[in-house]
Amino acid sequence: VSFIFLIDYKMLKVEWSSITSNSFNNDSFYGDLSAILIQNLPFWIQLFRTPEISIALMDEWEEKIERMAIATMREDVTNISGVPSWTLVLLNKILNLSGKQNITEIWPNLELFIHGAVNFQPYKEQFRKLIPRTDMNYYETYNASEGFFGIQDRHGSDEMLLMLDYGIFYEFIPVAQLNR
């Protein structure tokens, strides 16, 4: 991958991210984990992501989607990550504002959607209609505020790899011993 490639393309994060300063301590904040992560990303990551932090951290969902659509449709997005239902709302908003028929008309280099939080199957056909590329890649993650548990690590397989070395304790109990 060349340096020019990294500068020219963007990753789009679609998430509900809200953060609030602590009224008792101006140096501490509380809010969604994704918002805290966004606010603490290294500066160089901001070069490769869209939308800008001020939009990503907006509280009001309708205004946020509108501003995200306007800001991101001018970028050359190659990958998207987010919850499928929220991402569909944004993609449809972008199509409505742009007058285009599908997302590949706006982002011809889009090739990857990393999704999680919900079952993707009910949304898959909608994504295929919005992004009619036979080479579009869809990968699932399984994470929560408590940690990152699994990732789909193989193309063409819905199986996920359990992340055993991420500082999470797992205890596996045989089904026969559950009621003991």
Kindly give the residue locations of the regions a language model identified:
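Active-site phosphate/ATP/adenylate-binding loop shared across adenylate-forming ligases
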Residues: 1-180
